[in-house]
Amino acid sequence: MRESGILMPVSSLPGPYGIGCFGKEAFEFVDFLVQAGQKIWQILPLSPTGYGDSPYQSCSAFAGNPYFIDLDTLKEEGLLTAAQLKAEKWGTDPKEVDYGTLYVSRFKVLRTAYAAWRKQCAGLYGCAYYFPDDYYAFTLANEEWLDDYALYMALKAANGMKNWVEWDKPYRLRDRKALAAFAAENEEEIGFWKFVQYKFAAQWQAVKAYANKKDVQILGDIPIYVSADSVDAWVGGALFELDADGGFARVAGCPPDYFSADGQLWGNPLYNWEYHKKTGYAWWVRRVRHALGIYDLLRIDHFRGFDTYWAIPADSTTARTGKWENGPGMELFDALEAALGKLPIIAEDLGELFPSVRKLLADSTFPGMKVLQFAFSGGDSEYLPHNHVKNSVVYPGTHDNTTLTDWWENGASEKEKAAAAAYLHLTGVKPTAKELAAIRTDDVRIALLRAALGSVADRAIIPMYDWLGLGAEAHLNTPGKLGGNWAWRAADGFAAKALAKTIHDECSVYCRV
């Protein structure tokens, strides 16, 4: 069945509190998707943002982002007042997330809400340590990760938010007596972090249930690696490659290529795949099971890393010293499928791929990705629409690409422009510089959107900013750039009925409605 969807990060929704969240704007966006004939809402990872404000560098592979909790809902529950919300600063530009300001204001009001909730519970149950049944149900269902997460965040707060490798040895090495003593002395702080996850889960499940009721599926995203500064790394131990001192032996990255002479040094700890194999990939089963409770479909980032991955000594300053190692391959996905059933996974298979990676993708039967911005650099590219396959997902660009408008005006080379113009019938087959200069940017944008929708690929996902025709201001992420990413927010009223009709009509032409 041919269908289409829209890539729209939760953080990019409009709203009064500095960042998109699970409030009325999320429900209104689902309504917009329905009006536009869309079946998929693709979002970025819902994990807490970490280094560089990235959702791909999170403090937890299981926790949700506290920033997404809707504060108006907490106000309706009697946990916050309008005056308390009005007193805080949420940023100066409603079209951009100010993560620095948000870090201060969000946690301040969430702590206020937590104190009010504790007081509310004490009044209801006559005891300061009795809580609602759904809270106990949530903590019990998620105890495998929640207890460690809450303890980790409390320890992090007590240590000035430093990386756990800088904590005192008893905490760093998880000495039982030291952790038990800390937990006893910091019950309220640990409770705060559980409360945050409790509210996150309740609100997100309400949004997801509403979307599913409207026949809209949520396409989520899980990074292959965890952050070095995370509860997963702190607790994981044998899950990762460790040296004799218990530190990380090697870290993740990419080898040198045309774009980077030194390669990319990501710094994420690498998995000890031999250990995972011995456990039947139990941690991965837990992780994917948890993700399937949050999302309907899963995009797995850096899929090629399950076949072969670049391993770099932890003390290296560049990725040049790394080498290729073999990943778990189909054995991992067979274990996941045996435990969880058929997996609704989309593989991020972009970039140069070894034949073995292509074989893994074929053996898994997961759909891969086709990105049109990569199609026009020369030759018979696999990303050109005539080379697409049915079992794939086509995108004009991903969150790591700029917008179509900015790509044409500032990103594409003259060679790419000429190839795209000819392919999209915007000029003759050999356009002159004058002919290229005469092309309207919006004509290119619409032609690329139609090329994506017209692809044989089963699914077409269009970023919201490309439907809106936005430029560089909406560029979500520039790989390798630290700071200034993940900030774009849509303007109030962006999800207009007229735009929904345009999207519906365009998708109807290509039988995606």
Annotate the PLM regions.
Residues M1-G37:
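Mature N-terminal, pre-catalytic/accessory segment of carbohydrate-active enzymes
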Residues P9, G18, D53-Q197, A201, ...:
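Alpha-amylase-like alpha-glycosidases and glucanotransferases acting on alpha-linked glucans and related
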Residues K24-T49, G293-Y295, A452:
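Catalytic domains of carbohydrate-active enzymes, especially glycoside hydrolases
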Residues V34, W204-N212, E337, L361-A362:
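Surface-exposed amphipathic alpha-helices with a cationic face
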Residues L44, Q217-L219, P223, L297, ...:
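Outer-envelope exported proteins of Gram-negative bacteria
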Residues W193-V226:
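Conserved, well-ordered alpha-helix/loop/beta-strand core segments that scaffold catalytic motifs
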Residues G469-V513:
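Structured C-terminal cap/extension of enzyme domains
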